[in-house]
Design a protein with these regions (language model features):
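Class I SAM-dependent methyltransferase SAM/SAH-binding core
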Residues: 48-50, 54-100
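A short acidic, Gly/Pro-enriched loop at the edge of an enzyme's catalytic core
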Residues: 102-111
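A short glycine-rich, Lys/Arg-flanked "PGG" loop and its adjoining helix->strand segment in the class I
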Residues: 124-139
Length: 258
């Protein structure tokens, strides 16, 4: 199942409004933490951005000297906006499901993905495809919703008191992997829950070496900007992993060019 909720008009507009608000979790937590995992110097690199969305990150990588940036997203609306707003001679945008990428062998120095992997049903398939098009010793860096956040099988994971105050986060059904339907901007958004060990062991089994793992939480100063962030210190909202392809990694990904 390849889900394309971002071309839903209601969802798209709600998401656009969310991203235009620079005090949300993406801007004050996910993006800074993700950037901390990137190489200091992107000059001359060939970069693949999976789930590129509006293309902001692609534009940033190109402006920092990347020789080529390819942004992939399943959403026609996202790709259209990216082409309009974040054009650059070193950027190419491709409207394609992440699950269907088929770039040439050892094409990229760096493969990046921000908050997209929890929408993917077959993680192993995607990792094999990434491994194939990643150069030896190249890096995969990705973020996703934390397994603690995706485990619940109810729409809202917070247990609240009679006044609606958030008392604690419900952690249940952690080892029951698979589809989750959650209410986020619209009802019944499909995500895929995997345990921490499944995510890491799938990476290792595909031939990656895990270099660094982050479970970022907001700094207290950020709560001044957004008071709701104090609740995000009570459980990890995001998981971020930096993994490296070794010299002896096998290649089982399809070889056709998109």
């Amino acid at each position: 199942l390849k889900q394309n909720i971002y071309d839903n008009d209601i969802f798209y507009q709600a998401y656009l409004d969310l991203r235009l608000n620079s005090t949300g979790l993406n801007d004050v937590l996910e993006i800074p933490a993700f950037r901390s995992l990137l190489p200091e110097n992107l000059t001359g690199m060939r970069i693949l951005d999976l789930g590129c969305g509006f293309g902001q990150a692609c534009s940033r990588y190109a402006s920092q000297g990347a020789a080529k940036v390819i942004g992939v997203d399943i959403s026609k609306k996202m790709i259209s906006r990216a082409k309009q707003i974040y054009r650059h001679e070193n950027i190419e945008y491709v409207c394609l499901p992440i699950e269907d990428i088929g770039f040439p062998r050892e094409e990229f120095d760096l493969v990046l993905s921000s908050l997209a992997f929890h929408y993917i049903a077959d993680l192993k398939n995607v990792l094999e495809r990434i491994l194939y098009c990643l150069k030896n010793n190249g890096f995969l860096i990705f973020s996703q919703e934390h397994p603690v956040a995706t485990a619940k099988q109810i729409p809202d994971g917070w247990c609240k008191n009679e006044n609606g105050e958030k008392m604690h986060w419900i952690l249940d059904d952690y080892n029951d992997e698979g589809i989750r339907k959650q209410n986020w901007l619209i009802k019944d958004v499909i995500k895929y829950h995997r345990t921490m060990s499944t995510i890491m062991n799938t990476l290792i089994g595909c031939g990656f070496k895990i270099v660094k793992v982050l479970e970022p939480t907001p700094i207290k100063e950020a709560e001044i900007i957004n008071k709701d962030l104090k609740n995000e210190r009570r459980r990890p909202p995001f998981l971020m992993i930096k993994a490296q392809k070794g010299q002896s990694s096998t290649h089982s990904c399809r070889r056709e060019r998109v």
